[in-house]
Amino acid sequence: MKKETITAAAVLCALGAGFLACVLHTDQPLSLSERRPLAQRPEVSVQALASGNYMSEFETYALDQFPLREAMRQLKAQVQYYLLRQKDNNGVYQVDGSLSKIEAVLSESSVRAAAEKLNRLQETYLTDSRVFYGVVPDKNYYLAEENGYPHLDYERMDAILAEGLPHMERIDLYDCLSAEDYYKTDPHWRQEELEKAAGRVAQALGVSIAPFSDYTQETYQDFRGAYYGQSALPLKAEPLHYLTSEALEACTVHHYETGADTGVYETEKLAGKDPYDVFLGGADALETITNPNAKTDRELLVFRDSFGSSLAPLLVQDYQSVTLIDLRYVSAQLLEQFIDFHGQDVLFLYSPSVY
């Protein structure tokens, strides 16, 4: 009887402690590790109660705002990885401390559709331009196959693009990179490791890049990338480096959406939810880097995804301006309202997830 009383008291104490923690816990607006907003307490109404929506929304809210939620996510991930020996958690796997996300299914129809879209852009705006395209290899290209993980059929993707883009010149970047050239906790490549890749792009375009020895390397020490939160593993932060020089400091970036003019690096973004946004301020539909000290009067248009943010500053040396266009955020039909197409060099540069 005494043992049962002690057990019951322990259970009641645990429940009481849990209830007290929930009461005292302050609701958080977002999860920094997952980089997403958290559900907030739903409003009570007769309509919401009658429809059942309130309980459904409250369940989501309770799961998001559970006081020990982050600790439980980490515990689950460690059990799956290290105790149960599962090869991934939430689709994220780990090889020698580097995280990557499984992407195994190549949508050939999507690749063909992307090629058709690029062709339409070339026919509409770029008939007087030299046009190049390249694929930014994802980290899986260097990690997945040799470590037993499924991966995209990169050769098939390249073949579809080559067939679909007959009037563009391909820039091959696969042999310019390795797994070590990417952040351990993020899908993006590391700017300080792009000398070979940037040189390959510049060579194709017929321009030069500044030697990396000319740059000063600035460092943010507390970078935790997108895969850090998705994996839920308690990994150490890693450094994020960005390259500066007097030439880059003289450049300005015009953001068409806001009308703001900034520097190439927006260092205040380092304190935000995604420090990678330090490169050109992060996601932006349309922006132009102006270089007052350019060695030529040439101009470059880069149709890109987020990988282009850290590469573009390395290409400005010979260009009077470099305009970056992200078609995920602006319709191609609106481009001529902002850009005077007159034979600029053109580069389409996307990672496999966009193609």
Task: Report the location of each language-model feature.
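Extracellular glycan-modifying ectodomains
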Residues: M1-Y355
